[in-house]
């Protein structure tokens, strides 16, 4: 007798072993038809999986997030099936699920074209309509490797040969196509109804630039056409908001080949940067942080002591001088520990909070660079808190409160929080980890925050909290972190004198709110579509004269506003006023101040707000008061 416990708590009993599909059918024909897989004691499995023991089971349908993942994974295999039918000489490699879709990497003797993608997608639709059953079989490693070698699929054979002998090898087949996969997959290809191929990009075999370059075909798949249409619309909107495009249009920054992954900031872009940096500086100063500055280049010995030289060297820029090896810092933490160590610290000094807008460099692969979002040179709003074990919860609470407030000020109201817990390989005792993890939970609870826990995702030296902000298009970006470190203080010899005169290691909290300033500015630009809030805008207002006779008044007005702290410029060009208004409207300036003879004579100004809103004529003081009202919450 097999007892199956369902999500509603009910138990069904079967005289013999049953498949997931049979359990679904016993519940009802509708569920049997909708079933894509099952969650058996928490593990995602195929509908053909046989249950021969008492277990808990949830039937997975297209209404579940797991169901969508199964659909996307199966659609990746459908893509490979179609490619092999149309281009038999192409070799298949891997095809995982990614955010909003999937990809599959192929080795082929010529580049795939947009026309090829159309043909492949059409063939996928034809194969899906055949509604061919998807079957799974478990084989030995040698049998699987031999099969793929026999059909000329060298990449698949190489993958299999790297799998431990003891691991289970699953092969999935539909129609004339067989692929290696952990699964699960849909029961038949007819379940795959809504998908689209998006683009082709380059990729290296096993992600190593020394290996052969492959072709990566990206696709998206959904359960409903409305969802796919909404996603494609979001992509169109994202293209309009692309920070690289807006950076050029708004004259904020540029990148060039002579300095890959580094940013050339233009005056308006640097003005935007300064608003973000000065705001962050004010917030950390108010929160009791002490700002410091540490060297960009430090001797190899320090990086060896911290462990970065052994574990991170390939991502570091190094140099040599007078027979000494140096590294340009990829992160600020070892330098902050040196400041902490400079002098004898007492428990009375703690907590010590060191902040730095630290300039870091990492040798990212050139193919991974992407505008401001992935760079080699960046500044981080970095800080490290040195405290006692008794203080780390209160410090975590204070940081959570600060981070949430900052995100709100920048216009981000939806924050997803994730707590990464102990990995298998880790430093410290289970007792220490349990205290650290529970402390972070308590800090989040005290702030009224909810979070998702990620078992095994913590760093080997401690658990961490991640803060993921959601932008105007619903995209999620990880920006902030709060990382507890049980290792670096010991590695670098940081200690303080406790109340009983013993020497103890401080608890070290690594923390950042925006993370990379460059990346955060890219996110901000796209979130606001370049129309920055008044407090962030490079220029808050532009004064426009209609004719030469108002130039002197326009210039005087500009100077008056500048003295009151307004970021303002005058456009006195001998151009039609309609032309000047249109140009500055495209530049997304919050306020355009138009002055003609009437405004000059009355010492007033005609105000146009962003979006073409005519606010009418008002005294200069009234405009300044309106602007101050916009800014008041950030003063």
Curated annotation (Swiss-Prot):
Residues 1-61 form the TGS domain. Keywords: Aminoacyl-tRNA synthetase, ATP-binding, Cytoplasm, Ligase, Metal-binding, Nucleotide-binding, Protein biosynthesis, RNA-binding, tRNA-binding, Zinc. GO terms for molecular function: ATP binding; metal ion binding; threonine-tRNA ligase activity; tRNA binding. Residues 242-533 are annotated as: Catalytic. Pfam families: HGTP_anticodon (PF03129), TGS (PF02824), tRNA-synt_2b (PF00587), tRNA_SAD (PF07973). It is an enzyme of class 6 (ligase). Its EC number is 6.1.1.3. The keyword Metal-binding applies. Binds 1 zinc ion per subunit. SUPFAM superfamilies: Class II aaRS ABD-related, Class II aaRS and biotin synthetases, TGS-like, ThrRS/AlaRS common domain. One of its GO terms (biological process) is threonyl-tRNA aminoacylation. The keyword Ligase applies. GO terms for cellular component: cytosol. Catalyzes the attachment of threonine to tRNA(Thr) in a two-step reaction: L-threonine is first activated by ATP to form Thr-AMP and then transferred to the acceptor end of tRNA(Thr). Also edits incorrectly charged L-seryl-tRNA(Thr). Homodimer. This is Threonine--tRNA ligase. It comes from Burkholderia orbicola (strain MC0-3).
